[in-house]
């Protein structure tokens, strides 16, 4: 089942319909990012103007060697981090990501799925029912063995880091049902040493969730 429905109305106009009660928060993000957009209450859809809209998965396949350039990866980090912070202010948080969750709208990267989005209580995501493990997961989700269960919202920092590693290096941190170890991750990201992205990844892929930061400097 599709997480969202994207339709091309004409050459430069699109409609986007997302499912889930929490979709209004994602619509609000899109309205902040895209200047020319209108929300239609009757259809629970947003209409916007853009020259090019494609799924992020397809966008990656169109890049050289199926990888983002360093500059495009910086844009990915900046765009998605802003959306994470916005949702946190609204007391919502992602617990992980799937590549199908993201659209590329005129080279801007936008979350378009509420599947992995839950309310926050005291900066924690509360799990009261079973979930499907997102492909860009985090160590905390593997500890989810009983319900109810709570995880600090910073768990998604690791998931974003895993997405960035895949987008830039074409390498998954999740293999089967196991995440790479810290030593394995250090080896994977070693080619990025002394770049802004390298230190960003070191911060958000920290084993200790309390030490994780979304900071690109």
Task: Please annotate each region the language model reported.
Residues 81-93:
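Protein kinase catalytic-loop region centered on the HRD/HxD motif
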Residues 203-216:
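A conserved short helix/loop substructure at the end of the activation segment
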Residues 159-171:
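Short, conserved alpha-helix in the C-lobe of eukaryotic-like protein kinase catalytic domains
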Residues 156:
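Conserved catalytic-loop aspartate of Hanks-type protein kinases
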Residues 140-153:
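Conserved end of the kinase activation segment
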Residues 29-71:
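Conserved structural core of kinase catalytic domains
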Residues 76-77:
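Activation segment signature within eukaryotic-like protein kinase domains
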Residues 94-136:
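Activation segment/activation loop of eukaryotic-type protein kinase catalytic domains
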């Amino acid at each position: 089942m599709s997480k969202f429905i994207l339709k091309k109305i004409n050459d430069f106009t699109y409609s986007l319909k997302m499912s889930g009660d929490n979709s209004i928060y994602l619509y609000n993000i899109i309205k902040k990012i895209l200047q020319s957009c209108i929300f239609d209450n009757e259809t629970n859809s947003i209409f916007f103007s853009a020259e090019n809209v494609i799924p992020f998965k397809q966008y990656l396949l169109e890049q050289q060697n199926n990888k983002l350039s360093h500059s495009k990866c910086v844009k990915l980090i900046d765009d998605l981090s802003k959306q994470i912070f916005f949702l946190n202010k609204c007391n919502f948080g992602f617990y992980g990501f799937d590549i199908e969750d993201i659209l590329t709208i005129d080279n801007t990267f936008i979350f378009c799925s509420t599947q992995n989005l839950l309310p926050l209580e005291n900066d924690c995501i509360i799990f009261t029912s079973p979930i499907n493990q997102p492909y860009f997961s985090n160590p905390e989700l593997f500890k989810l063995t009983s319900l109810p269960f709570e995880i600090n919202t910073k768990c998604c920092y690791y998931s974003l880091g895993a997405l960035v590693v895949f987008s830039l290096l074409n390498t998954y941190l999740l293999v089967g049902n196991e995440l790479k170890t810290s030593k394995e991750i250090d080896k994977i990201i070693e080619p990025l040493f002394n770049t802004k992205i390298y230190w960003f990844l070191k911060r958000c892929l920290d084993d200790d969730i309390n030490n994780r930061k979304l900071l690109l400097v």
